[in-house]
Amino acid sequence: MRIVLISTYELGHQPFGLASPVTWLLAEGFEVRTFDLAMEKFEHDAVRSAEFVGFYLPMHTATRIAVPVISAVHQRNPTAHICAYGLYAPMNAKYLQRLGVNSVVGGEFEDEIVSIAKQVARNESPDVNETREAVVSLRKQSFKVPTRRDLPELSKYAFLTMPDGSRRTVGYTEATRGCKHLCRHCPIVPVYNGRFMVVQGDVVIDDIEQQVQAGAEHITFGDPDFFNGVGHATKIVSKLHENWPDLTYDVTIKIEHLVKHAEHLKTLKDTGCLFVTSAVESVDDDILEKLDKGHTRRDFFRAVELCRNVDLGLNPTFVAFIPWITLAGYRDLLQTILELNLVDAVAPVQLAIRLLIPEGSRLLELPDVVTLTTGFDEESLCYPWRHSDARVDELQAAVEAIVEEACKSDLPRTEIFKRIWQETIRAMGERDRIQIDFPSQNSSKLPYLSEDWYCCAEPTKQQMEIFI
């Protein structure tokens, strides 16, 4: 049986969510093609002749981009079984099914995809016009080394720019999935509900090895929180450094875990970690409490200090625009970033992110959130909301426009930050009242990944114009 697996967006990385199920499907004798539409054009003949088409939907941006592609595939091959899988698939199952999706799989998806594919091959699947109940599998799996040979080569993906201007080819892998925390705004929670799954260490190392052989000089670990299983994590990076002493990497870790497991930060640094991405989200303690983030403003400051003590970069991410933020609060966020000397560590899109409230979000437990929303909007994949102060929504739109335009012209982060600051002061009516000393445009000594956008941001017009 001919199978096609499709990814639309994975933060500029070679998609683990394509490469992993390919191995499982090939082992069962299926003929599998993959298409990463973020990097390559779709081959019409491949989808027309496929009997099973799978769409990998890991987060918001990828799913928004995938919607018109799913519709087009269904129109061009109405007899193909279409499967949507990944974190965002079960949360949007009803909408996806109306687009033509037959099966929906969330959580640990590889084994379920194989099971469905076998049923389709044996003609045991429901009629193509029927749909299955969405499945969320949290069964532990024995992972297999991902098959990456048919994906675009690593050099075509996002690269790492070093302080001296040199570039490194970047690979991507995952050591865990899910998360043991229950942050209210996080889209992982409705699917994994506080559980995380470990990818066996030998699989992770073997996956890294094949990417090093393919030219990877740096590895991004895509785990939602690398320190969910801190013992597992430190064993993997120790083995990584033992095998490839010159290989660098980056990880994502909660502020709470950076503080709690501070003794392991030096291990990260000593084994080649260049920087840690951390979801700070806000510098307002009341907002952090509403989000149930597990850290405070002071903890954020402490994490910055701890990372600097071992010369480990910290790249904060934010949900900058949220129902409880004020104009003054947003200005405080910018001022805090400036005072902590983090301007070059914050990707500009982070200053434009507007809170997304997906189906099943714990934010809907809060009465003041419910009163702000107007019901679930399937096409936008979230509950739309308006700020009680229209000026905040206007500022968010202006900041997003600044960032999107700046991404086209390759402006330095310091210049983008300056423009956002000026727009904020204009929105507050304080154009001439606050004088700020901005860092020079050549002050950055931080490595950073070249991908401009983010998994929780609305896709740009260019991203939505995928040609199939």
For each of these PLM feature ranges, what is it?
Residues 230, 241-422:
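A structural motif corresponding to the C-terminal lobe/cap of the Radical SAM core domain
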Residues 28, 75-76, 98-99, 214, ...:
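Alpha-helix C-cap/termination motif
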Residues 1-209, 213:
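Acidic, low-complexity intrinsically disordered segments
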Residues 15-18, 63-67, 198, 230-234, ...:
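Conserved strand-to-helix beginnings and helix N-cap segments that scaffold or border functional pockets
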Residues 8, 37, 87, 224, ...:
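Cofactor-binding loop segments of dinucleotide-utilizing enzymes, especially the Rossmann-like FAD-
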Residues 2-6, 26-27, 31-34, 41, ...:
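Radical SAM enzyme core and accessory elements
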Residues 51, 102, 217, 274, ...:
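Short acidic/polar active-site loop segments enriched in Thr and Asp
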Residues 152-313:
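Radical SAM [4Fe-4S] cluster-binding motif and immediate context
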